[in-house]
UniProtKB/Swiss-Prot annotation:
Heterohexadecamer of 8 large chains and 8 small chains; disulfide-linked. The disulfide link is formed within the large subunit homodimers. The keyword Signal does not apply. Its EC number is 4.1.1.39. The gene is rbcL. This is Ribulose bisphosphate carboxylase large chain. Substrate binds at N123, T173, K177, R295, H327, S379. Residues 1-2 form a propeptide. Belongs to the RuBisCO large chain family. Type I subfamily. It comes from Rubia tinctorum (Madder). Its main location: plastid.
């Protein structure tokens, strides 16, 4: 009797470990308009050829496993497998290269960012043949984009709702982020909105803690919104964080916000999850609420240069899942952000069509086919002296959000808000008159000081 470990030729396949490149490395493949394309930065273990590494990524993120299985014969692998179709070296990095992988669209559930990420990045990042792996970019085909509803409203609808045009919007995160009572929290909201800001914001970790339950916060913030609107004649908002421990509780909070007739709610989309985020986006679209998105936990995923995912991928995913604002870095504040790279994914959030531009980190041309745009939010570590640079870098379709840069004003919250509004309007006016904000920014702010506390 032959050993049980042997496989007879009549079975139709040979068991054992198989080189991935024999099946999944296809340099002759011409990508289809319907393929999802991915650019991976691969850092492999020594001694493994690049073709095998790239093929391994394609296999383990699609139909492959470590051996041939008999059920391979029951389907069409050529139809469903991912393909590594191109490999290019990374300049200055001997052990790294970019592997381009094409995935057939049939591998993905329609309208599900969750399923897309589960397939592409859910398993392969723990593959021991790779020392590190980073997803640099995705090309989402038009056929897949059209299965998503995207942002609840988008940039133009938001401006129409707020009746605010021709300038960036101004926001402020209430500080201290934790510990205030609901009434004192609402007072700070009122002072900032009354001083000239368009929005105030819950911090990402303000949910419903013992010192301030969510319902109390919502009520006092709504009162602050109504009062400031009545006194200024402008539409105001506060990002009421609806993030919760369950989707049901999250929706309950959003329903209460709608009953209070406030304009906007907020979600922590990475910690909350893409399924929850898409559910909330659908509710906001159906009920006239704007949706502000915070990216809490993003640096766990995107901070390392050779492992994880670049934020441009998370930004694309958010535009598909749904959100009207998302934090996008500042370039000039206290958090990391290279100018050209940051502007690359800012354009991916706002524009309908973006050409491939490797100098800005954009690996693929992306056509959003009129999926609504997302306002990038510049936040953290910024103040009025950054206003000229922020106005020049981000342009009008953005939210400039100052926390300590408002509440840290020596005369108080309202004067801090006035200072921000005066600085912004001075910069916009100077820009419209043809002045160079990069050259004259300091003078513009100094000239504006006489109109501001």
């Amino acid at each position: 009797m032959s050993p049980q470990t042997e496989t007879k030729a009549s079975v139709g396949f040979k068991a054992g470990v198989k080189e991935y490149k024999l099946t999944y490395y296809t340099p002759e493949y011409e990508t289809k308009d319907t393929d999802i394309l991915a650019a991976f930065r691969v850092t492999a273990q020594p001694g493994v050829p690049p073709e095998e590494r790239g093929a391994a990524v394609a296999a383990e993120s699609s139909t492959g496993t470590w051996t041939t299985v008999w059920t391979d014969g029951l389907t069409s692998l050529d139809r469903y497998k991912g393909r590594c179709y191109h490999i290019e070296p990374v300049p200055g990095e001997e052990e790294q290269f970019i592997a381009y992988v094409a995935y057939p669209l049939d591998l993905f559930e329609e309208g599900s960012v969750t399923n897309m990420f589960t397939s592409i990045v859910g398993n392969v990042f723990g593959f021991k043949a790779l020392r590190a792996l980073r997803l640099e970019d995705l090309r989402i085909p038009v056929a897949y984009v059209k299965t998503f509803q995207g942002p609840p409203h988008g940039i133009q609808v938001e401006r129409d709702k707020l009746n605010k045009y021709g300038r960036p919007l101004l926001g402020c995160t209430i500080k201290p982020k934790l510990g205030l009572s609901a009434k004192n929290y609402g007072r700070a909201v009122y002072e900032c909105l009354r001083g000239g800001l368009d929005f105030t914001k819950d911090d990402e970790n303000v949910n419903s803690q013992p010192f301030m339950r969510w319902r109390d916060r919502f009520l006092f913030c709504a009162e602050a919104i109504y009062k400031s609107q009545a006194e200024t004649g402008e539409i105001k908002g506060h990002y009421l964080n609806a993030t919760a421990g369950t989707c049901e509780e999250m929706i309950k909070r959003a329903v209460f916000a709608r009953e209070l007739a406030v304009p906007i709610v907020m979600h922590d989309y990475i910690t909350g999850g893409f399924t929850a985020n898409t559910s909330l986006a659908h509710y906001c679209r159906d009920n006239g609420l704007l949706l502000h998105i915070h990216r809490a936990m993003h640096a766990v995923i995107d901070r390392q240069k050779n492992h994880g995912m670049h934020f441009r991928v998370l930004a694309k995913a958010l535009r598909m899942s749904g959100g009207d604002h998302i934090h996008a870095g500042t370039v000039v504040g206290k958090l990391e952000g290279e100018r050209d790279i940051t502007l690359g994914f800012v354009d991916l959030l706002r524009d309908d069509y973006i050409e491939k531009d490797r100098s800005r980190g954009i690996y693929f041309t992306q056509d959003w086919v009129s999926l609504p745009g997302v306002l990038p939010v510049a936040s953290r570590g910024i103040h009025v002296w950054h206003m000229p640079a922020l106005t020049e870098i981000f342009g009008d379709d953005s939210v400039l959000q100052f926390g300590g840069g408002t509440l840290g004003h020596p005369w108080g919250n309202a004067p801090g808000a006035v200072a921000n509004r005066v600085a912004l309007e001075a910069c916009v006016k100077a820009r419209n008159e043809g002045r160079d904000l990069a050259v004259d920014g300091g003078d513009i702010i100094r000239e504006a000081c006489k109109w501001s506390p």
